[in-house]
Amino acid sequence: MRVIPVSTGKASTPTPIFDTKVFTKYRAVTLRGRTYTVPGVPYTICVSANEAICMHAAPWQENAGKAFGVPRSNGCVRIPLAHARWLFENTPKGTPVSIQA
């Protein structure tokens, strides 16, 4: 078992609670939303078929000294870089994922 600190969606953009699986993986990808574009997001694992909800590294959060474990995202699950890399390398497509409160 591995415990990984994460940051999920803010109250205004909550992360959905659901059972799913890994659909797609990107070593680096540009994430886009209505109010943001973030290029080069590393170790991205998408857990919704439309790629709207993903788990990914958030180096900008680490670089700003903002702790994980606090809701900060626009719906995705943000993970510290080292943990995101481990998860990316050890989670094949099709792996079951359960996102809980």
Q: Which residues fall in each region the model found?
A:
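A structural motif detector for short, solvent-exposed N-terminal "entry" segments of globular domains
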Residues: 1-12
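Exported/periplasmic cell-wall-interacting domains
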Residues: 13-19, 24-101
